[in-house]
């Protein structure tokens, strides 16, 4: 009895599966078309060969859909590479225009920097010499570098020998401020002060009185006791 019931159920199952089953032929395109995207449906219309060749045909169809896009990508890349030098040149032009506007806006400061450029270069090449120059007073620099400091002094532009002569007298002028007694004993100063004396006689008299002037500064009491000074002055 149980065997009959089992056979009956088997027959019912087979009949139900046969009623709902779909038969696909060997050359049918339904399974492949359902798996591929819509834009490849035309490429697989001829796929009705052996199932072993179907993956190869699908690969060819996919490659055929991608290859038309490659030339466009290559053209865009080459165009970008050609535009890179133009972009670099444009950036340089913009930078040059900005620097030019900065120079025009502050022309005085730019000119001053250009005039001091030799000293800045000396500072980068020889730091010791540059620091030594920085320690010098500003009024002594034209004596060492008359060409660079020529625009800063009108006397140097009009009469360079007189300007250089004044620069040579500068150390002695500083000596006069520190020690007047030592300043008056400098014999090398007499030729520079010839223009002060009205004539040669007065200049000679000043030269003869130079030791006594030194004595007057060091010891005024002894100076007034000198008979030579009394006879010379009175």
Swiss-Prot record:
Miscellaneous: The alpha zeins of 19 kDa and 22 kDa account for 70% of the total zein fraction. They are encoded by a large multigene family. Structurally, 22K and 19K zeins are composed of nine adjacent, topologically antiparallel helices clustered within a distorted cylinder.
InterPro entries: Zein (IPR002530), Zein-alpha (IPR051903)
Coiled coil feature spans: none
One MF term in the entry's GO annotations: nutrient reservoir activity
Organismal lineage: Eukaryota, Viridiplantae, Streptophyta, Embryophyta, Tracheophyta
Name this polypeptide is given: Zein-alpha GZ19AB11
Residues spanning the signal sequence: 1-21
Function field: Zeins are major seed storage proteins.
Keywords: Repeat, Seed storage protein, Signal, Storage protein
Record-stated family: Belongs to the zein family.
Database matches in Pfam families: Zein
């Amino acid at each position: 009895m149980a065997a009959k019931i089992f056979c009956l159920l088997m027959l019912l199952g087979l009949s139900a599966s046969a009623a709902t089953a779909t038969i696909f032929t060997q050359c049918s395109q339904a399974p492949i078309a359902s798996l591929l995207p819509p834009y490849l449906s035309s490429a697989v219309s001829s796929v009705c060969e052996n199932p072993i060749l179907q993956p190869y045909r699908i690969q060819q169809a996919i490659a055929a859909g991608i290859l038309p896009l490659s030339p466009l990508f290559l053209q865009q890349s080459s165009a970008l590479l050609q535009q890179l030098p133009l972009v670099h040149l444009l950036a340089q032009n913009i930078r040059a225009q900005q620097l030019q506007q900065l120079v025009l806006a502050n022309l005085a400061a730019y000119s001053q920097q250009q005039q001091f450029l030799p000293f800045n270069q000396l500072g980068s090449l020889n730091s010791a010499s540059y620091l030594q120059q920085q320690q010098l007073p500003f009024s002594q620099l034209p004596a060492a570098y008359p060409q660079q400091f020529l625009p800063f002094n009108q006397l140097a532009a009009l009469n360079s020998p007189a300007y250089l002569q004044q620069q040579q007298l500068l150390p002695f002028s500083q000596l006069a401020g520190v020690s007047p007694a030592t300043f008056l004993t400098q014999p090398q100063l007499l030729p520079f002060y010839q223009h002060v004396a009205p004539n040669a006689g007065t200049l000679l008299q000043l030269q003869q009185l130079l030791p006594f002037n030194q004595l007057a500064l060091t010891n005024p009491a002894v100076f007034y006791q000198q008979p030579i000074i009394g006879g010379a002055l009175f």
